Curated annotation (Swiss-Prot):
It holds the Pfam family Pterin_4a. It comes from Caulobacter sp. (strain K31). The lineage of its organism: Bacteria, Pseudomonadati, Pseudomonadota, Alphaproteobacteria, Caulobacterales. Transmembrane segments: none annotated. This is Putative pterin-4-alpha-carbinolamine dehydratase. Belongs to the pterin-4-alpha-carbinolamine dehydratase family. The keyword Lipid biosynthesis does not apply.
């Protein structure tokens, strides 16, 4: 598999809504709020299944109904199209 090309956080944000630059590194982040823990965990489960398919895994933190996500591509040393793909998937299922 070829190494993903770095596009950078700014380019990624121009394609997404509600995401922000993570200041410590070339990454993007978003916080999702759900009705309760079960909804948050269901979201994380669906994302985990997609992450395995893409072989691209998020950094995240969960407390009750809140899921904080950070996306970056380690092989690209920054944000790549894989992060945009994952972010769009997350946004799509978070509102479903």
């Amino acid at each position: 598999m070829s190494r993903p090309a770095k596009i950078g956080a700014t380019a990624a944000l121009s394609q997404l809504q509600g995401w922000a630059v993570v200041s410590e590194k070339d990454a993007i982040g978003k916080t999702y709020l759900f009705a309760d823990f079960n909804a948050a965990f269901g979201f994380m489960t669906r994302v985990a299944l997609m992450a395995d398919k893409l072989d691209h895994h998020p950094e995240w933190f969960n407390v009750y109904n809140r899921v904080e996500v950070v996306l970056t591509t380690h092989d690209a040393d920054g944000v790549s199209d894989l992060d945009v793909t994952m972010a769009r998937f997350m946004d799509g299922i978070a509102t479903a």
